[in-house]
Amino acid sequence: MENSGCALEVRWVQGINKKKVTFINDHTVCYPCGNFIVFHDTNTGKWSFLQCTTGSTGAFAVNTYSEVVAFSDQKLHPTIYVYTFPGFVKRAELKDGAQLDYSLIAFSHAAPYLASYSSIPDHVLTIWNWQESIPLCSKSDSQTTYTTLTFNPMNWHQLCLSSERSLTVWNIEICDNQYQLKAMPVKLPSEDGTTDIEEENLNSHTSNSVSYYGPLMPTSAVAGLVGDEAEIFIPKEQRKHSVQPSFHCWNATSDLYVGCAGGQILSISAETQKVTILAQKDQSADHLSRTTLLEGNIKTMAFHKEGLYVAGNDGVLHLFTIKGSEVKLEDSWNAQEPIDSISFSPSYKTLSITTSKGSLYLYNQRNPEETYKLLNVYSRDLLAADFLTFGNKYCLGTDISGHVQLWSVEDGKSVSSLNLNIQATAMACCPSSNYAAVGSSTGHIYFIDAVKTEAPRIVQRTRLYCVPVQHMHFDPRGNFLLTGAADRHIFILDARPSYSFQVLGYIVVCGEILTLSSLSSADTQQTKVMALVCPVDERKEEKGGTQLEMFSLPLQMLSSPSEYIDERGMFKDTMIQKISYDVDQPLFSAVMGYNSSSVFGYSSNETILLKYVIHKDISGSPVTALVAEKVVRGSQLGPGVLCLSPHLKWMAVSGRDGIVYVKDLLNMETMAQLQCHSYHNGGINSLAFSLDGQSIVTTGTCDGALVCLQWKSSGRSSSRLGLAGEYGKDLALSLQAAMKEEDQALSRMPVWTADADSLGVERKGKEYSQLSVDVTEQDSFPNTSANDVTWIKRKLEEAEKKETEKYAAEKEVIKTGIKKLRKTIQAMMRENESLPDIEKLDQQEFNLDTEEQERLYLDSEKEVARVRQEIELENLSKQYLREVIKQECWDSMAVKGRSVTAFHTGYEVMNYPMKERTPKELEKFARVLNLMKIEAVDLKVRKEIVETQPKIGPDDEEEVEEELMKCQDSSSLVGSLSDHYGGDTSCLYSQLILHSREEKINQIILLQDIIQNIKNAFNKDFDTVCRQKEQEITRVMERNNRIQEIMVELNLQEKLLEPTFTDNEKPERALTVDDSEVKVERYLTPEQKAKAEHLAKVEEAKRLAAQEDNAKQRALDDMMGGVLEVKKEDILRMEVPQPVFLARTEAEWTEEEKKQFKEYEKKCKDLSEEKEKYSKEELKINNLLFSLLIEEEINTRVAHLAYILDKKRKQKNQTAEIVKSFKSQVMAFRESYDNLVAEDKLLDRGFKKEFSDITSYQVDQLYKLYKRRPRVQRLRTQADSTAPFGERPGSAKAYKDSIALLMHAMDELDTPENVPEGVELPVWQRFCLARRSKIEYEQQVKIKALVLAEMQAFLDKRIEEDEKMRQDIENFMQELNVLRNEKMKFQLDLTVQFLLKQGQVELENTDLIPSFEDAILLHRSVIEDLNSTIKGLGEQKIASMVESKDFRKGIFQLEWEHRKIRMEMEDLEKKSRDISLLHVSKEFQVFLNEQNYDKRMSDQIQVLEETINAQEKQHGKNVKTYKKILKDLETHINKKIIANLELDKDLQELLVSFSERKHIYDVVGVEQSTEKAAKERYMEIIQRRKLVDLAKIQAQEIHELRSEVDRLRMKTFPALVQMEY
């Protein structure tokens, strides 16, 4: 490629990221698009582009202060790049900050800092110094994925991160060179403006009063939570939907304004995290409406000096002024589209507004009426783009929503647009006329007139398919339009507008159409077409790959198309010379080469390009099996799409890697390549050449970018480009006349409408209507009606109509023959019915179509089998469910649940359904019982050993025994009457000693056993009553039979009372199905029918025999009631017979009858009362369970407090270590600061000593100048500035600039003109150096003072945190101690159940003398009735709650199963994707390609063995050499050791002699050195004096020379003498 001399470059890029548009300076807007950053100058309209060469751009940010742009690439371990504007110089690369991708990046406004946030999987917030490319600090937060990141413009130490569920303010704290991030989460209010109830640390309050409910516990302890979950737990009933932040911005007071998805605006203090909901003054009193400022979602905000700009889904830009918690709407501007983002320019005079449809407006803040639309680009994924005609002026693009837009090829400006409001699926531009064809998902083709580029329009619509159009292709000369779809039909249309885009016909291919390619030849007057097809069904299995189907379209077809098609519109294969070719590899894309003698394809399985040559055999017929003659490397990621240049010399390859490769077809080598799109988004979607080959336009997959490429001008590539240009010019000249004619015809065509289309159809006399489509600017798709038929369907109807007319006579003859044949067969069937059985024929003998009958029979059998299988499966599932329910609710029950109902009153008493006690329960009960016995024996023994028994006299023994008997018999302290109903309470603990947890649990086990015994006793009584009722019903039935006989004899017709058992009394009925319950007639086989008839006859015989006179039975009925012996229990039952007066109304009863009725009711009522006898034992269990529950809550709270204490202690240790470490750093830095201040003071004090060689007057003058400092002018903000943030804090750059200004001012002060009188120049120069040194020290002191103050503030915060941690630990310790005391008090304050006499009510005596003036005396039966009603309603409510709970559980179970299946589906998809992307290594390829792989491996092993042997020999030689060298070195070391010992001895002697000589010198040479020093000082003074005199003389000479220079300069000035005219 380097030798080709050709290179591509980006001409322009179009597309916009709607949420990332911002200013980089006052007149330049920038935004990311694909893997480009686009910069647009709003003044000149010029474009510039910055490309991300490593992939698609991810996060994006701009610093207007430094005019730099930062963006991240999308790859593994991404990098953040920082570039300058407009030079695009790389300033920094920030690496190792994320693993997968950066979600957000943001610049600080003044300081050289950048914040980045990476989401999954690390969730890390990192602060960078982008100028030095180093990370300063980072913090991980794995619980939240944030969506917005901003720095505080007034304080770079603060930044804010927000997501849809949370908002966090981060503080950057600095201590010298160490940085730390501290998070301050903000508690968001609910949507109605209230905040959730926060869980407080409720301290247990000590109290002397006994509380039945125990100490007050927080909700988390009641829920049983311990740990971090308890800190954030809020009960479900107290939870409220909080606001959802969507965007935030800072104001000038360092507060935050937050816009929410529900239309609320919040004001948050960054220091205190206090949240205020802003509301308008004039809103209604409704609290919810007051908290909602805008209808719909607030998507973006921007703060200005005049107020807050807010925009969102409503498409209106609002300006609010805020005062306190109230806002006022000042102004608004309607964009008529949902607004996605807004951004101010650095001067805050212009606001950029980006809408969801891709429009970019520039809003003038001072003059809103001057707002104009800067851009109008695609808002969705691009479908395709192509050049109009020659391709040197305009190109046309379409997105998937049917939005058509025209662009200028020269500069990329948007010319016009047209919204079709359809789902576009394909697009192509005609090379011979200025129009485009767009295919839709409904199978329609829309023809767009672009002659007037400023106003494109729809001129015609044609429906060809019932499925979406997938392919559209024009031949190179614009004569034919070819379309393809999934139904395997290729339609050929006349592409000339003068013929109204006439449909010429269609062909059907053998499979799915992959690509279409054509080649026109002016010599042969025909067009070669090739379709790449993927066969389906059997053909695919036979061929195993793709096929090439080629056919020819002669130009003569345009004038007489009917000669080439049949009556149904299908082309004849012989007329178009259709032929198919098989290729050796499956292809994804293919194009025809020059003269259609070669085919180029891109493999579907590999990233290779293949060249096929079409040959002919000896007989002259073409070879249908093609083998690749040349294979070259394609793109990096496949598969790819191929596109030929118009002059057929180049081929462009575009794949998923996003790179455009241009190859020379002569040698298949790459001429040029350029990265246009990112492989992360899917690479390139479409590519097109201009007619002269000078431009290429590409669209990306899912990145919304439209890229136009051009060739770089160079001498080496001019010849190739010239050939393409010449071909384009020649083709344009040949098509110019036709183009002019067709454009005129296109201009004459009216605008297409649905009404005009329908009228046109009616004029042609057709009986089908057209589709009604509303092509407006709204986002609505057309509704396809049933009458909107396709072209092929109309052709079929016309052909059928012609065939019907042509063969009408033949059809009539056939119909007449069929009628005669039917009559003959019917006569034969009637004759067959009259024949004897032996001569009759079967019915099927008269069936003429046995095959159809057999088919129908088989279909019916299949359907019956399917239905039978479904019914069997359904029955099987129901049987399984029945068995499960029966096992759980019936078989496992030792005592089945049932009831007994009174005959007349409706009273119903239920027994206790009981399961068998498990061995574990019995073992547990036995263990507790043995424990009780052991404790009783132990207590008895201890009492005998320890206690002294008092002596009891004989007179007192009887009293003691009586008291013991009373205590044993009394059940008051036991708390129930369970021992009267089968329960043994002798083994229970006393209620007054239940303190420990184990005792309470053992008591519950014993009480459960007592309840079990009570239930068993009750069930026995219940069974007795049930048997009595059965006997009573049997007796009544016998009586009824006798009464029935008497009534028959007396001819009476009265209804008798026939008592029966209800379903609750006989629950086993639910397990069987009675024949009466089956509503469908039972199917019986012939054998079963015969058996049923026999049984019916037997029953009838029995009934007739029973009707005969039976004297014995009648005698028994008359004398003894139908029995031979009257049993005793029957007599007892007869004591309370059923009253006969129940048939009368209650008003007719006598007093005696009422008395009898009450006695009759008593029995059932007693049974119902016995049911409540065990409730007292259950009350005791509930009390114990309640105490255990409270104790569990206390233990949970204690465990949580212990967890918090442990956590706080660890944090306290950490804070203590941090304080200790930073305190030492601060002390060390303070020491260095004090030293620097001391040095600075020493400079001040030593000034006069340094200039002691001059007079005191001169020293004073110099000292004043020494203290003088120049004034540095500062740039102040203008009073009329619209910037809301004013003067921001100084940055490091500003400080450096101020130092530079100071030094520049010092240079002016150091000039010789400022030398005081009498001071010599050398002294002045020395003074200037001293003053500069003093200033440098002062600046260092200032810097260190600021750093020290910052470090001290940091240390104070850490000390404050450490103290707060200590205080928290003390508070929690105190709360824990109080809670333990409360626990002990609660364990000792027992709840005891006493048994009171029935009918007594205990009242609290609040006064000394109780007053009963307002009291009412009620009978206990009233209260009992009320209680029974309440209890019944409570049971109903509990039943409904249980049913609701079970239903919710079922929903949750289904949701979990759904999620499980979804996850399994995702796992399977991932496995499938991994299998499809399985990488085949080079070794596998060698193994597969090598025929004798074992021989190859043996040869390699032999070579390796020889190599190893050679290396071993060489290694042995090297070892010997190294051993020899080592031996020599050891000998040399020994010699050196001996020499060093000798030198040590000499050194000791030299040291002794040196010390002796030094001592002599110190004694003798002091006086000589003093005299010598004085003499040297004197000579220095003399020399200095001479130098001063010389400097004065030279200064005088310089002064004289300067005066002479000034005099000579004045002579050279021109003399301007006023002249008179």
From Swiss-Prot:
**Organism of derivation:** Xenopus laevis
Q: Which controlled-vocabulary keywords does the entry list?
A: Cell projection, Coiled coil, Cytoplasm, Cytoskeleton, Repeat, WD repeat
Recall the taxonomic lineage recorded for the source organism: Eukaryota, Metazoa, Chordata, Craniata, Vertebrata
Q: Which InterPro entries match?
A: WD40/YVTN_repeat-like_dom_sf, WD40_repeat_dom_sf, WD40_rpt
Alphabetized Gene3D superfamilies for the sequence: YVTN repeat-like/Quinoprotein amine dehydrogenase
Its annotated compartments are: Cytoplasm, Cytoskeleton, Cilium axoneme
**What name is this protein filed under?**
Cilia- and flagella-associated protein 43
Intrachain S-S bonds:
none
List the effects observed when the gene is inactivated: Morpholino knockdown of the protein results in embryos with impaired function of motile cilia of the larval epidermis and majority of embryos develop edema around the heart.
